[in-house]
């Protein structure tokens, strides 16, 4: 169990705490976006220090930023690159990363990408999402799918964006920074007990 602590705006209030049982993080975001290499490396190091392993997709943009950072990190063996197409496996393996097609054959490209995304979300404990597509200045469809499916599966998501996701009765939304590296918002499915997600609400 890994516990995260989020300070609240009212200084008198105790920090909000939530826990995740597993130790795998999905690194995801816009295929047109980017994160500086040093920032990716810092995030990877901080997550690995907590014992996390990594899932990352096969697309361009944010996926590529994290793949390249993982490839030169000491933790490259603790990463799975989930691919929608066999043609993308070779590039990830050429970086020294483990990669595999995770969808059944015969799907359309759009369906394969969707299935790959859902495969990663289901197997992750939490998600780091960089959702804004800079070409349109809003969330892309892939990022929306990641967020919706993570909430459905009760996985906390750190959204690295200037504007928060929409308010919802299904999760708590908290402005925060991640390891002092990224500013954004935690979206945390409603907790119970020691901080685990409450399946009974869904």
How would you label these PLM feature ranges?
Residues 2-23, 31-180, 193:
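Acidic/glycine-enriched connector segments
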Residues 25-27, 202:
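Non-catalytic, mobile gating and regulatory segments of ester bond hydrolases
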Residues 165, 184-185, 189:
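Helicase-associated low-complexity regulatory tails and linkers flanking the ATPase motor
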Residues 188-201:
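A charged, well-structured terminal subsegment
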């Amino acid at each position: 169990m890994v516990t995260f602590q989020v300070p609240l705006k009212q200084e008198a209030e105790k920090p909000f705490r939530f826990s995740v049982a597993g130790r795998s993080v999905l690194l995801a975001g816009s295929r047109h976006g980017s994160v500086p290499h040093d920032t990716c490396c810092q995030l990877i190091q901080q997550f690995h220090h907590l014992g996390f392993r990594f899932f990352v997709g096969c697309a361009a943009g944010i996926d590529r930023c994290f793949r390249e950072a993982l490839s030169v990190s000491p933790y490259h063996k603790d990463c799975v690159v989930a691919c929608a197409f066999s043609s993308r496996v070779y590039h990830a393996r050429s970086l020294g990363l483990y990669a595999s097609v995770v969808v059944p054959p015969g799907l359309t490209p759009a369906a394969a990408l969707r299935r790959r995304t859902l495969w990663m979300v289901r197997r992750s404990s939490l998600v780091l999402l960089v959702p804004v597509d800079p070409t349109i200045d809003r969330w892309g469809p892939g990022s929306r799918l990641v967020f919706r499916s993570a909430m459905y599966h009760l996985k906390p998501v750190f959204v690295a964006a200037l504007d928060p996701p929409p308010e919802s009765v299904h999760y708590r939304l908290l402005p925060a920074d991640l390891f002092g590296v990224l500013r954004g918002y935690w979206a945390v499915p409603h907790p119970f007990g020691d901080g685990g997600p409450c399946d009974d609400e869904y």
